């Protein structure tokens, strides 16, 4: 089932999310719905808060990046078929010289900005079968994971750009909060205050 994606300004996007257990109600269905929602919106990652759930769950499918002409053959091979579910993730390490890449977010439609992130990460998480894993990633895969991990920590990519750049996107963010954004996918708009 395709779920509506929560838009910028909704308080759930600013929550530090709660861990879940393997007995979480409808976990398998929630994960399946998140993948369907992400694919419908042409995304490469989606975190549970983006569908209104304040839980430590996010998904990544970096395969679409594997067709890019701007990456090495080695990175393209790593991206090809990369699809994972991350539950109760903990970022153990972020290291290396930060590099910039233009990021966007399904909760912030039509906004893209350069964000600096470390190229190498070590992350601990449970997969969809609740098998505990500790893995290292680098490059674009690491970046997508960091972006989605930020969501479960209540952080958005717009928090990582300069004050100067924030001024340029201020009107777009306001439009999203006012329900004026019109992406090609279902969105749950922030309720207007009365």
Swiss-Prot record:
GO terms, biological process: co-translational protein modification; translation
Catalytic activity annotation: N-terminal N-formyl-L-methionyl-[peptide] + H2O = N-terminal L-methionyl-[peptide] + formate
Q: What Pfam families does the record tag this protein with? A: Pep_deformylase
Q: Which PANTHER family match?
A: PEPTIDE DEFORMYLASE (PTHR10458:SF22)
EC number(s) stated in the UniProt entry for this protein: 3.5.1.88
Cofactor binding note: Binds 1 Fe(2+) ion.
> Any idea which positions bind Fe cation?
105, 147, 151
Active-site positions on this chain = 148
Q: To which protein family does this belong? A: Belongs to the polypeptide deformylase family.
Keywords from the named record:
Hydrolase, Iron, Metal-binding, Protein biosynthesis
An example of a GO molecular function for this protein is:
metal ion binding
Q: What class of enzyme is it?
A: hydrolase
Q: Which gene encodes it?
A: def
Q: What is this protein called?
A: Peptide deformylase
What is this protein's function? Removes the formyl group from the N-terminal Met of newly synthesized proteins. Requires at least a dipeptide for an efficient rate of reaction. N-terminal L-methionine is a prerequisite for activity but the enzyme has broad specificity at other positions.
Q: Which cofactor does it need?
A: Fe(2+)
């Amino acid at each position: 089932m395709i779920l509506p994606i929560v838009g910028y300004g909704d308080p759930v996007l600013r929550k530090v999310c709660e861990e879940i257990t393997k007995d979480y109600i409808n976990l398998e269905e929630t994960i399946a719905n998140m993948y369907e929602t992400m694919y419908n919106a042409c995304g490469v990652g989606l975190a549970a808060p983006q569908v209104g759930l304040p839980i430590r769950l996010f998904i990544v499918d970096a395969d679409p990046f594997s067709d890019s002409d701007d990456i090495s053959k080695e990175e393209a091979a790593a991206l090809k078929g990369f699809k994972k579910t991350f539950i109760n993730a903990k970022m153990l390490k972020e290291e290396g010289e930060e590099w910039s890449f233009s990021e966007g977010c399904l909760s912030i439609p039509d906004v893209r900005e350069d964000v600096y992130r470390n190229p190498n990460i070590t992350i601990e998480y449970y997969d969809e079968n609740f098998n505990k894993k500790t893995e290292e990633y680098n490059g674009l895969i690491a970046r997508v994971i960091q972006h989605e991990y930020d969501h479960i920590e209540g952080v958005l990519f717009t928090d990582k750009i300069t004050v100067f750049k924030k001024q340029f996107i201020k009107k777009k963010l306001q439009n999203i909060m006012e329900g004026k954004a019109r992406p090609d996918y279902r969105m749950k708009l922030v309720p207007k205050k009365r």
